[in-house]
Curated annotation (Swiss-Prot):
Its main location: cytoplasm. Belongs to the HisA/HisF family. Heterodimer of HisH and HisF. One of its GO terms (biological process) is L-histidine biosynthetic process. IGPS catalyzes the conversion of PRFAR and glutamine to IGP, AICAR and glutamate. The HisF subunit catalyzes the cyclization activity that produces IGP and AICAR from PRFAR using the ammonia provided by the HisH subunit. It comes from Saccharophagus degradans (strain 2-40 / ATCC 43961 / DSM 17024). SUPFAM superfamilies: Ribulose-phoshate binding barrel. Pathway: Amino-acid biosynthesis; L-histidine biosynthesis; L-histidine from 5-phospho-alpha-D-ribose 1-diphosphate: step 5/9. This is Imidazole glycerol phosphate synthase subunit HisF.
Amino acid sequence: MPLAKRIIPCLDVDKGRVVKGVQFVDIRDAGDPVEVAKKYNEQGADEITFLDITASVEGRETTVQTVEKIAAEVFIPLTVGGGIRTLEDIRTMLNAGADKVSINSAAVKDPEFVKAAAEGFGSQCIVVAIDAKKVSAEGEPPRWEIFTHGGRKPTGIDAIEWAIRMTDYGAGEILLTSMDKDGTKDGFDLAVTRAIADAVPVPVIASGGVGNLQHLVDGVIEGGADAVLAASIFHFGEYTVPQAKEYMQERGVEVRL
């Protein structure tokens, strides 16, 4: 029996509000995170991902309080990311009620941090988030590079090699966002999703670019993703989670109804 594919609404939170941007800029407000999370919990989302996109020092306390409030209302797995830099940060978020933490820039800065995190808390709690951008020219073999700091800082690191290294270090899941597709609504970058899904032994969550329900199906069937993450199609009422699940099931994708 194949494992059911997961639908994960994503809350990008900036200064205590859910927002949605295009290619990491051009932000619009999508509501109060606790209310938004409750709505998805009621709709039957499989998980929720909460990414603190400001994640500045002054924002941390607010984030912890928001995570506590969400965890009190929501009974599906909650992943929290943004500004997770130390083992203490991980402990704080897990104690606040997160089930998993997502590590991005801190992993690039110190890959051993991922190893220590997986050893300390278990791989099942550790998600490594990868923001990948295509850097190969037309006609060259496709190549994607890791960017950090909300997609602003190039690292020179190959995305596929990095995904393999991170799973070797104990990451239990890869959250893959295509920087080229983020917010565009024209579908996932299926090539990089497939390349990473084929390269690593852990689940891959596809993110960046969902504009319709067919894109979710494509992410799973063509991209090989184990889970699909979406924000604006759910936040702004274009589709509901049950509609997405029904659509996917009708097209032969195993989902939890």
